[in-house]
Amino acid sequence: MVRLREIPRTAAFAWSPGANPLLVTGTRSGAVDADFSDETKLELWDLKLDSQEQGLELQPIASITAESRFYDIAWGQPNDEHPRGVIAGAMENGSLDLWDAEKLIAGEDALISRTTKHTGPIKALQFNPLRPQVLATAGAKGELFVWDVNDTSAPFRLGTAAAHDIDCLAWNPKVANILATGGAGGFVTVWDLKTKKASLTLNNHRKAVSAIAWDPENSTKLLTASSDDTAPVILLWNLRNSQAPEKTLQGHDQGILSLSWCQQDAGLLLSCGKDNRTLIWNPQTGERYGEFPEATNWTFYTRFNPHNPNLSATASFDGKIAIQTLQNTNPSAAPAAQNNLSDDDFFSKAASQPQAASFSLPRAPAWIERPVGVSFGFGGKLVFFNKVETAAGQKRSSKLQISSFSIDSDIGSATDKFEQAIQSGDIASICEEHIENAKTDEEKAEWQVMQTLSESDGRTKIIERLGFIKDEPVEEAKEAESPMSPEPKQEDSASLKPNGGEAKKHRRVVSMWGDGDDGEDFLSEIAATKGAKTDNPFNLLSVGNTHLEDQITRALILGKFEKAVEICLKEERWSDAFLIANCGSKELVEKVQTAYLQQKRGSPSYLRLISSVVAKNLWDIAYNADLADWKETMVTLCTYADPSEFPDLCEALGDRILESGNRKDASFCYLIGSKLEKVVGLWVDELQETEQAALNEEAGDSTFSVHAKSLQQFIEKVTIFRHVTKFNDSETSLTEGWKLAALYDKYLEYADIAAAHGQLSVAQKYLDLLPTSYPPAETARNRVRLATQKAGAQTAVRQATPAGRTTTTTSSRTAAPVGYQQPSLVPAPANPSSLNPYAPPVPAPVSAAASNPYAPPLAPVSAAASQYGASSSTYAPPQNQGYAPSGYTPPTQSYAPTSVTGYGVPAQNFGQPSPLGGPPKATAPPVQLKRDGVWNDVPMVTKAPPRRNTPSVAPLTSPFPGQPGIASPPPAGPFQQGAPTPPPPPKGSAPPRNVGAPPTGPPRPSSVSSNATNPYAPPPPAAGLQPTYGVPPAPRTASPYNPPPSAAAPPANRYAPAPATQQYTQGPPSGSGIAPPPASGAYTPAPPAASQQYAAAPPPPRAGFSAPPPASRPPGGGPPPAAGAPPQQQAPPPAAPPKPRYPPGDRSNIPEHAKELVDILSRDMQRVASKAPASFAPQVKDTQKRLNILFDHLNNEELIKTETIDQLAQLAGALAGKNYDIASKIQVEISKEKTEECGQWMVGVKRLISMSKATP
């Protein structure tokens, strides 16, 4: 819980009926204020829960003086005449006063009427919840009146005068004419207003009835509470069988004064009483959920807020009305100082103060619990639950169902169809279907291109699709060539002619040797004829030749083709140059071609085309060709481009076309060039346009369906394109800078949609196409991988559920938390009698950390025994048990030395003693326990002073509660006989240490840690969990080891904090391990442990064994030698002369290197002592005491080594510099590494660090 506000009044109160939480208070009759004021007031209070500036204590918003004090007060529902309702007061003088709440807030005269019909004080009153104008009042001498608040002049009376007062009444919330009353006579009367007679009387065994509450859901059930201290119980009655109560709720120590049954959740009940406690219950099951912070005086009135039951208010005679939340599940703060400081002298003198409480409901309240819920599960699953109707008092349960779900069935079918087509490899049919269903020319052209690319000779088909056909004859040139022209030309027979339209004319170089095939045949025949002779002789160097021709002839004669070609090029005799070059090398031909094309630059375009083809440089065409002829350019690229350059050339041409604004033709170029990264950007834009067009059609599809279908078309297009082009993504190993990032995002989106429709394999397929380190896909990959794991690989065994099938599971909300195990050794025994002050204590069981967010928090258990815990009998036969489960046999084991178990229970050993007992095995270290907040965490937590809590009452597991349970040790009180007297300790053993006095009163064991933090107390160690070994839970009783009460003994201090337990208790200082006998039969407590809780003690031993102490050391320091070990047969070394010891408090012999640390610690201790609050004086005094122990060790130069002194000097320096973190770190290191040197003084050092940090 969290205390939100406090009202500093001892008053009766009532909640306002509206949503805004207001409280009205009236000075309580019979109470005396701290200032002994006799002033009586009616006041209104606004909680201001939404104001962060409002402090804990409130101030009234309206206040008027009343003529008499109040026994009870009620606030009725608003109506037309009274918009804020009517406030009714049950006055001590017997009058019924009514006030208008609206006028009271406005500061006007608010009194409506004052009527006196009662002859004595009015003890109780209540408005009828079903008829708000009806009011019932009850009081002294059995007077019971029913009023109409609109006309208070004529009330009618129920019943007749009686000897006993009526102290409480309650209207039935379901039946308007039923009223129940109760009083000091011990009877509960149920009245029927229709007959104006008592219809039923319940016998409460003549125990005074102080409170009545009707079941908010069942009109025949009610609760009654008794104010009798001898029977402080709550009884649940069913009027259908009124002979005996249906259930009894026990938990209060003294009489109960008030009940409040939550109207929104019949499983919640508040009760408060004379034991200063406010408890919360489940009245249907009788389970007690927890306890609110205990007050310092009687709590006489408690109520849930009628509008917001998470709020409740409790009034007590300590002068406060506490407004608090139902519970607090924030992680508990460090336990208060009393849980940390283990010195019994400190605890015996600690100031009495209330304890804090914290609890968590094991289930969510009804106003938070959802009766039905649904959630989409990954993989196309729909998970939903609904509440299963159960009878009152039974555990609430829900029916959980899992079914398949599809947002749009067409999406799933389209995906399946496409995947099947891909697996069949029928790409052509897919393309044909898309071509037929294409809605735009652009989409149709894209699918046609992909269909073409899927064929074997794709580039040839592309040329034909562009309208060109290879090897078609070309028309002869019509132009007349001049006979004198050095370069006669003709049409190139290998040129291309468009299929449709006017044919283009292309020129070609014509040989000077004439046209036709006759010359070629002739020359070939001559070349092939050996020794051919003609009648036409010629001169190599003719007289008619020019000088240039003779030079060419001479060069040819000598085989100098290069020189002959140079002469021809100089004279621009291109035909001769080409002819001669053909006789030479390939390089020579290329040289002539280059010179010719260079000379003819600017001539017809075919020469530039042939220049690019000859030079194998088609980039000039791709970058510079006119875009009006982009088809011819593409055909040229398809005809001449090298396969390695073809994609890039297509990309360059496509980029130019795209820049001109023609997306369709650019897409064509990208498709031809297999440039997926380019075409994807265009398709993404096309996807958005397609979606928008589909939405504008208003076909009735949802936005998601339209998007999913458009994305499906996009994915199919990309998939087919990758298939036909055999695209290989080379960027999957990159970590950033992906060119296909836009495509990856669509793949991821498509995988999510496929997974949402239950197609996990399809989703996995497309996730595998993404780069390995693609951050946006991490979550999707993990989800798909987990969802596709086989059942055998999971930790929990589950049944696989086919798609479309519904799995139903019924689960209980109050199931045991995960990780909890029942004790497996022995069953928990029955609670020992609370009247036996010498019964051995039994700690509460501790379970493992619970996963249930509504489970109650686990109490931190310290594996230790109380310093005042008496040892059990050395050996004794087991007692006769009242109950033993079938098959159980008490264990027998050899004699072991007496020890105290790790859970504070004296060990019990059965069987006859044997000579020696072996050492125990070390137990496992405690498990770290950390609880997080759950369903109703609140952002603001107001710290309260440390308060103690009360453990829950353990269940009865035996039909004979008065007898100890199985494996429980026999009671061994200080006055009992029967156990053999232990022998005295051997000579030479270390004497027992001094034992402090027991606490002044029986401390109440605390089962729940406080959430308040003591600024002067060091933070406690983390709470750990130890195995229970079948140890039973502890009852709520007085300390079992206190001496019997006497007439002169002071009363027990019920508010004193309980002494902290220790983690490790050594055996008695005896070589035999047996404690010495008590003198004259007087009770002697067990010696305290040498190692305190914060001294890094070893783990506790197992139950039934003694912890093996360390080896023997001199008496001034450590523990005694190991119990039960045989003596060492060695010659003792010569004893050194004993070093003189100085008296306590002497500081004159402290070594020089330790004086500075002593000065620093002393100064800081004085500073803390001067500024610490008076309530923490015991802690300060105890810390000073422990530091003096350290100084005495340093003064005597004993126990503490030089290295440890150096570390303490560093700690002191850090403390002087206010570096508390460093000081704490050094302290922890010393505690861990120098355990044998750390005694009681280390607790003082640790505490000083915490106090110094908290003191300004």
From Swiss-Prot:
WD repeats: 5-46, 65-109, 117-157, 161-201, 204-247, 251-291, 294-334, 375-403
Location of this chain's protein in the cell: Cytoplasmic vesicle, COPII-coated vesicle membrane; Endoplasmic reticulum membrane
Keyword Protein transport assigned: yes
Record GO biological process: COPII-coated vesicle cargo loading; endoplasmic reticulum organization; protein transport
Superkingdom, natural source: Eukaryota
Comp. bias intervals (Pro residues): 980-989, 1030-1048, 1097-1143
Membrane topology listed for this record: Peripheral membrane protein
Any one GO CC term of the record: COPII vesicle coat
S-S bonds: none
Compositionally biased residues, Low complexity: 800-817, 1049-1060, 1067-1096
InterPro entries, sorted: Sec16_Sec23-bd (IPR024298), SEC31-like (IPR040251), WD40/YVTN_repeat-like_dom_sf (IPR015943), WD40_repeat_dom_sf (IPR036322), WD40_rpt (IPR001680)
GO molecular function terms attached to this record: structural molecule activity
Task of the protein: Component of the coat protein complex II (COPII) which promotes the formation of transport vesicles from the endoplasmic reticulum (ER). The coat has two main functions, the physical deformation of the endoplasmic reticulum membrane into vesicles and the selection of cargo molecules.
Subunit structure: The COPII coat is composed of at least 5 proteins: the sec23/24 complex, the sec13/31 complex, and the protein vtr-7/sar1. Sec13 and sec31 make a 2:2 tetramer that forms the edge element of the COPII outer coat. The tetramer self-assembles in multiple copies to form the complete polyhedral cage. Interacts (via WD 8) with nup-20/sec13.
This protein's name: Protein transport protein sec31
